[in-house]
Structures are given as structure tokens and as C-alpha cells.
Design a protein with these regions (language model features):
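Small beta-barrel nucleic-acid-binding modules, primarily SNase/OB-fold domains
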Residues: 2-154
């Protein structure tokens, strides 16, 4: 075999290994708590969540893709393209959620929006993501009605 053939074979092996590794990281749910209800303590408050899953993608500052759930809209949080803090909001959500298990307190009165995204307060092990975005002025309150959550309560 010549050097070019060997290089191509090594490149293919490398690409296959990389793809399998990434698939394992994002899709391995042997130790996850996906789609299980439960409780979580955040800021000394006991939180009830309806679903949990690994965050596979951050779409923007208030929308994520969760394994086993689909697209999730952070309820009461507005992060609009081309707004001054849009990039910072997306970066914050990426840092806190991407590749990690997130816990969803789904809005019981309106579980989906008009785009079929699940409406929820999103938690990590120690952070209320919705609340942190608002408290950090990275997003504005965007209220959906009806809602189990009171306006500004997040």
C-alpha cells in the first residue's frame, strides 16, 4: 500500500472513532434520569420536575433540544435575535446546559406553545436557568397565558 492509501484508511478510522465517541456522549442514557418525574433542590427550594433528559443542542437563548423530549422553550423568558444580550444568553445556556442532564418543570396549564415546543422552567443540578437569565438581564420576561406560573414568578 502506498502512503496515500494508508492516510485515507487512518482518516476513516479516526472519523469513525470520533463519530462513535460523540454518539456515546450525547445518546448514552444508561445512567440518566430521562423522562422520570422527581424532585430536585435548587436554591434551598424543593422543585418537582416532570421530565429530565440530556441537553443535545442550544437553539438560542431560550430554546434547547432535550433528548427524549424535543424542543423546550424556557417559559417566561424572551431572548430575541439581534437583541443586545442575545449572544450572551445563548452562551450562558450553552455553558450551563449543553451535554448535561436538565430537569423540566413543565407548565401544567400550557405544556406546549404554538410551535409545539415544550414550555418549562429548566433546571440543572444547582441552577434555575430561567431565573438566572432574567436576574442577569440576559433576557426579558415573556409571559404565556394560560400558565401555572405567575408572571415574573420564575
Amino acid at each position: 500500500m502506498n502512503k496515500k492509501t494508508i492516510s485515507i484508511i487512518l482518516l476513516i478510522i479516526f472519523l469513525i472513532t470520533t463519530i462513535l465517541t460523540l454518539a456515546n456522549v450525547f445518546l448514552d442514557d444508561t445512567n440518566s434520569q430521562e423522562n422520570q418525574t422527581g424532585t430536585l433542590t435548587v436554591d434551598n427550594k424543593t422543585i418537582h420536575y416532570e421530565k429530565a433528559g440530556k441537553c443535545l443542542e442550544v437553539i438560542d437563548g431560550n430554546t434547547i433540544q432535550v433528548y427524549g423530549v424535543g424542543r423546550v422553550q424556557l417559559t417566561q423568558v424572551g431572548s430575541i435575535d439581534n437583541e443586545p444580550n442575545f449572544s450572551q444568553a445563548k452562551n450562558f445556556v450553552s455553558e450551563k446546559c449543553l451535554g448535561k442532564t436538565v430537569y423540566l418543570d413543565i407548565d401544567d396549564k400550557q405544556p406546549k406553545d404554538k410551535y409545539d415546543r415544550t414550555l418549562a422552567i429548566v433546571y440543572t443540578n444547582d441552577t434555575d436557568i430561567n431565573k438566572e437569565l432574567l436576574n442577569s438581564n440576559l433576557a426579558k420576561v415573556s409571559y404565556f397565558t394560560p400558565s401555572e406560573f405567575k408572571k415574573g414568578e420564575v
